[in-house]
Amino acid sequence: MCIRDSKLTIDELANRIPDGAKVALPPDYAYCSLTAVRALIRRKVKGLHLVGVPSLGFQADMLIGAGCVDTLETAAVTLSEYGLAPRFTAAVKRAEINMMDATCPAIHAALQASEKGIPFIPLRGLIGSDILAHRKDWKVGDNPFAENDPVVYLPALKPDVALIHAPIGDKYGNVWVGVRREQMLMAHAASETFVTVEEIVDGNLMDDLKMKAATIPGLYISGITEAKKGAWPLGIPGGYNADHEHLQRYVDLAKTCLLYTSDAADDLLCVD
C-alpha cells in the first residue's frame, strides 16, 4: 500500500470514525492524537465507546465534556499530576456515561485475544476482587488442566478503531512507534487503525533494521495524517514537552465548562 491510498486530512480522518464506534485510545504518556480528538469534537461525534489501553486521561475528559461519549471501558481515568478528570468525574456523578470497570492486565489480555483471533482468554488476578460483580461479561470457570483451580475468562476485546499518534510514518503507511508497544497491540486488535504522525518520511521504514522492530506495518493502518505537534498539549518522548500551562488552564476551565475544543496554543473555548 502506498501512502497516496491512505493519507487523509485531519477532518477526513475524523469522518472515518462513525458515531457509536468502539475506539481504543492510549494513556496520556503514550503518543495521544489530541489533534484527532479535537477534530472529532468539531464534527460532534456521538455515542463513542472509549477503551483505555489501559487507562485514559485528557483525551477522554475532552470527549466526555463535549458530549461525545456513552461508554468508558478502562482501568482508570486520571490527569496524573493535574488531579481528577473534571468532566469525567461530573459525568459519573450524574450517571451520564456507562462505566465498564477493568484492570490493566484485563485490558491488555482481552486485546491480545483479539490480536490472536481467539474468542476469549483466561486471567487469574481478578478472582477475589469486587470488579467481577460489575462485569457480567467476565466469567469464572475451571482450569481444564487442573482441579480446584478457578480462572476468569475474558471475551476478546476488538475495538472498531484504534486512534494513535506517532513520531514517524512513511509513504507506504508504515508507522514507527518506538518503545510504545501498546500501540502495536491496539493496531493488531482493532478492525481499523488511524494514525497522526509528526512527519511522513521518504523510504520504507520496514527496510531499516533499526526501525523495523518498532514499526507497525502499513497493512494494519487504515489512514494516516501528517500533523505537526499532533499530541499537543501533551508531549511525545524525545520530541516535545507537554504544555503544562495549557493543560492546567484546561483543568481549571473544565471544572465549570462542558465543552472543550482547541486548535491553537492561544485558543481555549468552553460553553457553560
Where are these regions (language model features)?
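N-terminal active-site beta-alpha-beta segment that forms phosphate/nucleotide-binding
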Residues: 6-102, 189-191, 262
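Conserved acidic residues
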Residues: 70, 158-160, 191, 222
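Internal, conserved structured core segments that host functional sites
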Residues: 94-151
